[in-house]
Amino acid sequence: MIYTSHYASPLGGMTLTSNGTALTGLYFDGERDFPHLSAAHKKDLPVFGEVMRWLDLYFAGKEPDFSPALNPTGTTFQMSVWAILQTIPFGETTTYGAIARHLEEETKKRMSAQAVGGAVGRNPISILIPCHRVIGANGSLTGYAGGLDKKEYLLELEGII
């Protein structure tokens, strides 16, 4: 069963999804990859309270010192990329190419920055899995499912730009 809740962020509304114990999605309302949730049930779950506390701290410009339970769903490759995203520290960035090189070292297989970009773009848990911290090799802000204006805001909030 899918459960939902809503969070009012400084960037607009966000929908949270959960399997009942962990966060499975965090989407800006209206973002391009927003899932169809007609079968979802609204419920007050402990994980939603934790995520909202985390987001309150984050949007106050503070680095939260705890991590709510996360359970994104994706391919093995996507999951490996998302695991790397979770290691990017607050206030820092990396590039798609750097993630590809990291995966090449781990797997001993060739990886392209474009493949990494595809996985980053399918991240179902915005902000907590910080895909906004991935930038182009030339330092440019590249795609973000919530929109480049939101990516820029998040990077400014973290003191990156």
What are these regions (language model features)?
Residues 1-107, 158-161:
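Basic nucleic-acid-binding alpha-helical/helix-turn surface characteristic of O6-alkylguanine DNA
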Residues 120, 128:
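Major-groove DNA-recognition helix of helix-turn-helix-type DNA-binding domains
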